Amino acid sequence: MILQALTDYYRVLEQAGKIDAPGWAPVKVSYALLLSENGTLEQVIDIQTEQPRGKKMVSAPQILSLPAPVKRTVGVAANFLCDNAGYLLGIDSKGKPQRTRECFEASRSLHEQLLAGVDSPAARAVAAFFRSWDPETAREHPALAEHLEDILSGGNLIFRTLDGYVHRDPSVRRAWDAFYQAEGDGPQGICLVTGQPGPVESVHPAIKNVAGAQSSGAALVSFNAPAFCSYGKEQNLNAPTGKYAAFAYTSALNALLADREHVFRVGDATVVCWARSGERGYQDVFQMFFSDFYDETDLKGLVGALCQGNPVVYDETKLDPSMDFYILGLSPNSARLSVRFFLHNTFGGFLRNVQAHYDRLEIVRPAYDKFETLPLWKLLSETVNQNARDKSPAPDLAGEVLRAVLTNTRYPATLLNGVALRIRAEREVTRGRAAIVKAYYQKLAETTKQENPDIPEEVLQVSLNPDASNVPYTLGRLFSVLEAIQASANPGINATIKDKYFNSAAATPAVIFPILLNLAQKHLKKLRSSNAGLVVFYEKQLTELCSRIGKAYPAHMNLPQQGSFQLGYYCQTQARYQKKEEAKDV
């Protein structure tokens, strides 16, 4: 399914002229070898370009469309018209002269084979260069002196003449296309992607730009041990992929990964997305759905229309909510890639799932919180110790949460456990943590079609529900009031009852709340002399909340009940702060 979707995407891009034709690929190139008509090396030209990197401009290799490079392992394998100094000049800095000589001879043989009979000045110049070039004296060549150190560092080189780059010569291009398309004597089979008979690739082109993978590229399809092979087949012949399909899916995936505007990280996974039509507008809108500026009114209106099934125009592109949309998450695994997830739905279907996720997360927010909706990265950060050196969330958790959001399924239990752990460790119920508790139990009830009596719908509200009769929720509200009483009686106090009693109050209320209520009476007595009206206000709150609890406090509370407690505490606290803000405004 993955290879088929990527191959279809390649066909769309090729028809639109947005990707290289079969046999050609984008390659990073640093220098051009300028040849005379008789093949003499005249000059080494630096073709690197200035590109932004952070706040600086740095020289970086230029990306050109060149004959598709081979995927190298430990053997010697030459590329046509573009390679490193070891293959094109017979010199390198690896200290293995015999192997370097073998590389040069392989390159010489390949170019002589392909350029034989090609009638063009560019082809004749390259052929003459390989006939006359002597690797033994190459380091002393005057044309190499200026850039010798950089050339030996491993950057790619290409050929050019006074008429232009050799790889752009029409006769040379035809020679390469004929060579690439020739079936040769390789293995034949039925392609598992296209279903067509023809040559199948034993080694597929490398996938590059996956965070954490080798810079030279990694394999998406790979069989490197006998235990993975069947029926005596070797390497990728165990998953027979035709030459065209192998090139198409790797080219499409590399194009997606090279488009840094539409690549994002979730944990250790590198995530790409695409629409079957190949239009970038779908990627733009999907990316913005997870960005910090999703709250912009025009974007929310656009997404709302798509969620309702209505086509919209974005950046001069008509977006169809029924368009097939794909999301692929890849993680590095040595020289290979692991598929973290692969999701397929309509574009509107994905947006509706994400919008439902945001709706579940909606909860009253503090005045200082600038995020109207909680982006995924901020959500995951609620499970991490912010004082730790590594503030990254668990890689598996990040992928599982994203999958749950995109497929509208249950959130992983590890998300709730991570939040519960941070609340116990820090004794702090932030907006994000309260939102996660609310969303987790809302989705659980929706999935099981059964309300949990320990954390019912009446407590899973956006803001404070003063009519809720749930005892754990009421205990959370009561704890917030007791904390407010202490703060009023002792302004500027360093440690409050939350620092000492929050966890135990949520777990064993019968033990802790009598202590807290006794302490509150002392605080009220102290406060009565300075603000009797405030004492009356607090006493009314205590009377109301205690009457909802009944005669006995619960001896123990389980995890869902503690979730109700945390939501009650958070909503009561935010309601108190909102009243203060409103009083200031008046």
Predicted regions and their residues:
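Cys/His-enriched microdomains
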Residues: G189
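Short Cys/His-rich metal-coordination motifs, predominantly Zn2+-binding knuckles/fingers
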Residues: T194-P197
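Short catalytic/ligand-binding loop motif for oxyanion handling, primarily in non-cytosolic enzymes
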Residues: V200-S202, R336
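Short microdomains enriched in Cys/His and/or Lys/Arg
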Residues: S202-N238
